[in-house]
Each structure stands twice: as structure tokens, then as C-alpha cells.
Amino acid sequence: MKLPGQEDFEGSDAHENVCSEQLDGDLGPGSGLDGPSDIDNGKAQGCKDPLLFIQLNELLGWPQALEWRETGRWLLFEEKLDIGAGRWSAPHVPTLALPSLQKLRGLLAEGIVLLDCPARSLLELVEQVVRVESLSPELRGQLQALLLQRPQHHIQTTGIRPCRRSNAFRKASRDEDTLLKHQNPLRQKLPPGAEAAAVLAGELGFLEQPLAAFVRLQNPVVLEPLTEVVLPSRFFCLLLGPSTLGRSYHETGRAAAVLLSDPQFQWSVRRASNLHDLLAALDAFLQEVTALPPGRWDRTARIPPPKCLPSQHKRFPSKLQEVTSLSRQSAALAENKHHHGPHTPIPELQRTGRLFGGLVQDVRRKACWYPSDFLDALHPQCFSAVLYIYLATVTNAITFGGLLGDATEGAQGVLESFLGTAVAGATFCLMAGQPLTILSSTGPVLVFERLLFSFSRDYSLDYLPFRLWVGIWVATFCLALVATEASLLVRYFTRFTEEGFCALISLIFIYDAVGKMLNLIRAYPIQRPGSPAYSCFCQYPGTGGNASEFDSTMFKDTEDVLNVHPGLVNASFLPPSECIRQGGYPRGPSCHTVPDIAFFSLLLFFTSFLCAIALKHVKNSRLFPSVVRKVFSDFSSVLAILLGCGLDAFLGLATPKLLVPTEFKPTLPGRGWLVSPFGANPWWLSVAAALPALLLSILIFMDQQITAVILNRAEYRLQKGAGFHLDLFCVAVLMLFTSALGLPWYVSATVISLAHMDSLRRESKACVPGEDPNFLGIREQRLTGLVVFILTGVSIFLAPVLKFIPMPVLYGIFLYMGVAALSSMQFMKRVQLLLMPRKHQPDVLLLRHVPLIRVHLFTAIQLACLGLLWVIKSTPAAIVFPLMLLGLVAVRKALEWIFSPQELLWLDELMPEEEKTIPENRPEPEHLFSGNDSENSELMYQPKAPEINISVN
């Protein structure tokens, strides 16, 4: 059966609703004709059908006082009016009885169907509808007056508004109703260009036979009394009939509203030219209806909106799909940055064949965006991002500065860490190709610094001059990589390599946070009763007594202690201050120890960690208004830190606080800011430094480019492009600068950079009921990172304020950053499958296409690689750590001998050579761990913001 509009689709207006910019664009899965999942982005609706708001008005009160009352409404899902509670139900999937659909088809087949009706007002529309020969003029007048009667809407506001009102009160409050319609919260959720459809259903005693009418207006007209939201109406459906048992016309009206809310039926009925087309669209809907057995479910149950639905595009006519496919291909060619083909690399990774050609292309590509990189930062969300990332950066600078000071025996310290972070980070944000990247000291680079210092100490070398030559060689090697466009190799960095490296970084964050807390507990030990190591005695001058005599004495209270004769008094009964007041001397290791610091530090540690997690996830909860939830989510880390600081200030315990250097001078006494090229080292060492520099260059390249690949994934919908060559060039220049000043080496920090992007997510404001906010992309700009690093530089002068921040609170934020990044990885979800019995495993797409044993094998290989990386990092063999990172790519290449390309497509990503073995029309497994109810449910119905994580789902 042909659907309406299919036979004339190739006509002049064939592309009226198939606009390539809207079919694909930058909306990702669910865009175009895949349904109304992209309606909330606020873009123009001229190239696709507008969103339809459907309202069901039911005729109630027969035979005493007839009135139209709103009982249901539809956008994407159904909302019923709970009359007893006086409120709208939660959006849910509508369920229909098959007899109601069959009855609706019969009514439409025998009723009035007006397509492209020229009516311009409700009166003209009603006059055409009531022109029924079977009705007498008197009944026509009664029916016309009834249809023109103002319906009673249920508009929820913050105030108390009764559902039922007297006629006199209704007349006096019409102006109030009009005002309420304009203030209706639902109106704020509708995108521009939305239209309305009114369905009127009910029973009339004076009718002898059913009266049905379906009207499609030629031009949308505002039929203001009919709908609660003032919108131009496109469709009008009337279903009236004689009184019957039950509420059959109520269900028939619901069936009509559900039909109009269906994307395929709506598309067809907008193009229908006669009754046959209308009935064909209804029959096509009936062919896809799924029936549930009556004894196996509760008909009153309300099914919540699903997270995933099948692609609506597959439900449209084949001819439309062909045109849509062509439109998608042309849009992909126009914007191949977001939707490039399987064999075509993105523009940033296309070889130019010229020396420094990739760098020149990056500079040209980013130059046109430079003014907007600052103007786009004028948003309150950027203020939250600055606070969050500033505290994370300061904490990172202090932590790695302290670790670097210990590793180099004071050759570098916290001050160098602050200065290097500020200068290198600010310079990178101003000049880099991807300014959202946050430069910082990283665990792998710190390991290399420790090994380099140990080598210098063992062979009596001057460390900083030797380090300078290593930095010069690293900068030279990196510039050579930029000149030869070696960044194109990032195409071989698949999810396997990214997850292995980034899981290691996340584990380093978690390990350092927990390790710092354990060191703090050792510094402030927990006092256990009866332990001699924590005893404290008060010794009076000139009196005898010993500890053993005191320990054998039992005391009931403090007065017994004060009356004892021996010269030693246990300070657990007598405070040191009381001992000194009475002329004694406190003696013992714990006399000046506050016993509550260790436990209180643990409390602050877990409070900040759990609070940050809870506030971050409150956005998806049902608590508080949406604006409050968004503020809590955006400022989650800042609020967690403030809560920890407030709790610490309230109790007033002497917990360790943030230490910020107050003097601007090198940590190592006697050295200036510029490092001498040779010092006490022989001249040939400048050449020998090339060997460790080669290993460090591999580490810098891998660390920088893996982070860049993750940040520039297409799922994040970045509009301004990447800059792989330009970023590596900036890192090379900064490597030379920091080496000359004796500052730490800096490279892209994966976890903090992802946290930076997480704090700059953009989501749609207009969200219809039942729909989650639509992820729109990242707020791309340079100002947040620049301000963060400027504040880091002036933090030396903010010491009076920063000194009140407890270190356990910052350790908790570190733990949160590591856990959040690790837990959101696809790798961790597959690890959970290892520990999950088969019957409890979720129904995910990955397990539908790959055998479970193969999934476990792939996960086990990843775990083995991660464990090997951790062991090498923690042993003296860490000097080969950069080679092991490069070895991840080799391991991934070797997996081609174990797994088929189809399995690797679902488990990982394909390398350039592997893509040639897969058809171009292959399925794209973008949501491997989304629980779908259909084999075709591979596209998200509503593309949500991807969690800013190590590996994007």
C-alpha cells in the first residue's frame, strides 16, 4: 500500500521537508527525519515538519451542563489529567485498545474530511464542519454553539487554581485565562515554529448517529480557545456520537491524538490529498501496532519514556529514504568533520605533503575562530568552569610540585610548579589549536623526571644542565614530528589504546589521592588506648615516680589523678595545659597530638568526594527545579570544596591546609632562574642527552596526542576543529622554555582536560515533557583556561585565602576526578560483565553481536596490558615506559589475528587498513551499552550529552 505523498514525491515540492542541513547537520544520531528528537535545539524548522502539540478536549456534563474540558495532551508522549489530584501526569508512552483504532477508522471513513481547508478562524472552521445533511438547522445551531464554547483548560501554575468554576466566574476571568496561557510553563518548552492540533471528543444525547470530521488547514491559524498554549493550529478532529455505555469516545479521541503524535502518520497526513491517503496512513500505523495480551499486564500502568527508540527514518517510504540518504551524503561532504566516511580522514588528519604543511593548515583553520574564542566565553557557565578547574589546577600544581621536590631533592619544587603551570598553561591557551586542553604535570612525565634525576645523582652529573639538554633534544624531535606531519599517526590510536593509557592516568589519580590520605594519617596517627607509643606523662620537677608504677594504678576520675603522689601523671587524664599550669612538664610523643585530626581528615576526604558525585548527578534527579539542579551540577566540585571548608572551620581542628609559596625565588638555594647549558657536566653529555630525549619524546607525543584525540572526538560536536600539529608545536616550544628556566615539563592532562570540557557542556533549554535535555556541544573558547592559569600564577599572593582550604578536601576532589573518569569508560563496563552472572547481564547491543567469551577475552587482554603498564611504571624499568605506551598500538594491531573485523568494530574501533574490509553501509555501534528493546535500536532517540569521560560511549 502506498503511503500518501509517495506517488508525487518526485514533484516540485519533493524536497520541502528533506533539507540536508537539517537531515544531518551537527546533531548526530536522531537528527533529520529520525523523529522529533532534535526539535529542542531552537533552530529553524523550515526544512522539516514542525513539532505538533496535540490537545484532547472532552465533552463532559451531559445532560445537565455541557462543557469542554481538557483531559489529555501530547508532544512526544502522553500526559493525562489526573482530575482527583488536579495535576498532569508524568509523560508516558500511550497505550491504545485496538477497538478504538478500528472505530476511529470507521468514523473517518464515513465522516467529513477537509484537506487544505481555507478557514481563517474558529467560526469559519465550525461552520464548515457542521454542514451535515442529516442534521436539522436547529441541531446545527446547537452544535455550532457547543463547538464555539470556550473549553476549560488545566494550566498548572505556582499558585492554587481550582479545576471547576462557576459560569459567572468563568466570564469574569477570561482575561486571566489569556494571561495564564501566555505564562504557561509548557509554552517555554516548545521550540519556535511549533504548531497545534485539537481533538474534540464526546457524547451528545440529541445525536442519532456519529459525527466525525478531520480538517487540515491550508495555513496554520490560531484557534485560541481550543488549546491551552497559544499556537497556530494545523489539524482539527471532531468525534461526537450518541450516548453509549463506558467512555468509548474518550478512547477514540485518544486514538486520534496518538495518531497525530506519530511522526510517520503526521508526515503522511501533511501530504495527503484525499480520504484514501488518510486511511492508508492509518492502516500503515495499524500494521506496526504491537498488541499485548490482556492478562499479562495492567492496562492502567503508565510506561515511562524509553531512553532509546528505533530509528524513525526506517519507517518512512523507501523513496523518501533514498532522497534522505542522498541528502545525508551531501551534508556529510559539506561537514565531513562531524560525519566523515569510513575511508576519508577528517581534515585535520589529511596529509599535505609539504614541510610543516599540517601546522600551516591548523593555523589557517583556527585563525578565523580566534575572535569568537573570547566572545563565546561571556557566559555564566564559564565562571563555574574557572572556579572548578582553577582549584583542580592549583591542587595538581601543589601535589606534583611536592612530589617533584621529593624526587629531585629540592632542585624543583612547588614554586617552580606554580610558575611553570601559569606561564606554560596561559601560553598554550592563547596559541594552541585546542584551547580546551589543560596543560599540567602528569604521572608518566613525573616518573621520567625521577629516573633522570636518579641517573644524574648516580653518575655525579649536574641535574639541571643535563635536563636542559634533554629538553632541547625533545623540542627538536617534536618539531621534526610536526614538520613531517607525524600527528597523522593518531588515526591508529583506537579506543583500545586510549582506554589503556587513560585508565592508567585515572588509576594514578586514585592512587595518589588515597596515598596522600594514608601519609596524612601516618603524620597524625590515631591514638589507641593503652598503646605506649601514644602515651603522654606529666613530670613534676624534683619528684620521683616512674611510668610502670603509674600504669599499674587505676583511677576513676581526674580528682584521683591530681591527688596521686608519684611524679608521673598520665596526661590522658591530665591535659598538658593543666600539667603546665601546675608546674609540670608534658613528656611523651603524643602530648601535643590532636587525636581527632586523622578521623576528621578522613571525614573531609569522603565528604568532598561523595558530595561532588551527588551534586554532579542531582541534575538527573527529580529533586528541585531544573534551574537549581543545573546550578548544583555545574558547581558540584566548587560546592563540595566550600562544604568541606565550612565543616573544617566550624569544628576548628588543626587539619593540614593548602600550602602556597609566599616568596618568588627558586626552591634550590644558590641557583638563578636561567639554567647554565653545561655547569659541571662534560661537553659530550649534550650529545648523549639525545638518547633519553628520544624516549621522552615518545612519551610526550603519546601523552599529548592521545589526549587530543579524546578531546576532539566527533561525539563532542566541536565546531571549531582540532589542531594536532599546532598543539604539538606549542608543547615543543614550551618544553624548550621550561627546560631553560628549570621548570617542570608540561603536557596535556587527560583527566583535568576532560573535566574542563565537562564543565562547559551546552544543553538545550527547551525540553518538551518526557524528553531529556539535548546535548548541543561544548562551549569552545580560550578565556576559561587563560583565566585559570593567570589565577594560578597570582595564587602566590592569594595565600591568605587559600590557606583555609584543607588538603583532605582537595584529595577528595582528586579522587572524584579519577573515579568519574574511570567509571564512565566502556572498558570498566566490560570489566563489570566479567563479574556478573550471565542471567543478570544487561541486554546491550555489544552482547547481541559478539559472543560473551570473545568480549571477556578482549577485556582480559586490556587488563593484562594495563597491569603491565602499572608494573613497569612502578619499577626501575620505568625508563622503557614510553616504549610500552607505543606498544599498546602494536598490541592492538596484533589483535587482528585474534578477532575478526566485525568483532573489532563492536569491541573497539577499526584502524585505517581494517576499514577497507567492512562495507561502507556498516552499522555504527555508537551506543554499545544502551539497553535497547529492538534489534534496530542502534540510534539514540534523544541524543544526550555524552559523559565527558575517557572513552565516549
UniProtKB/Swiss-Prot annotation:
It comes from the Eukaryota. Residues 916-927 have a biased composition (Basic and acidic residues). GO terms for molecular function: chloride:bicarbonate antiporter activity; sodium,bicarbonate:chloride antiporter activity; sodium:bicarbonate symporter activity. The chain crosses the membrane at residues 385-405, 413-433, 470-490, 501-521, 594-614, 635-655, 682-702, 728-748, 785-805, 807-827, 869-889. Pfam families: Band_3_cyto, HCO3_cotransp. Residues 385-953 are annotated as: Membrane (anion exchange). GO terms for biological process: bicarbonate transport; monoatomic anion transport; regulation of intracellular pH; saliva secretion; sodium ion transmembrane transport; transmembrane transport. One of its GO terms (cellular component) is membrane. It is a multi-pass membrane protein. The keyword Glycoprotein applies. Its main location: membrane. 4,4'-diisothiocyanatodihydrostilbene-2,2'- disulfonic acid (H2DIDS) potently inhibits chloride/hydrogencarbonate antiporter activity with 50% inhibition at about 5 uM. Completely inhibits chloride/hydrogencarbonate antiporter activity at 200 uM of 4,4'-diisothiocyano-trans-stilbene-2,2'-disulfonic acid (DIDS). Glycans are attached at N546, N570, N932, N949. The keyword Glycoprotein applies. It is found in: Basolateral cell membrane. Electroneutral Cl(-)/HCO3(-) antiporter that favors chloride ion entry and efflux of hydrogencarbonate and sodium ion across the basolateral membrane and may participate in salivary secretion. Also mediates Cl(-)/HCO3(-) exchange activity in the presence of K(+) as well as Cs(+), Li(+), and Rb(+). Does not contribute to Cl(-)/HCO3(-) exchanger in the apical membrane of the upper villous epithelium. Belongs to the anion exchanger (TC 2.A.31) family. This is Anion exchange protein 4. It comes from Rattus norvegicus. The gene is Slc4a9.
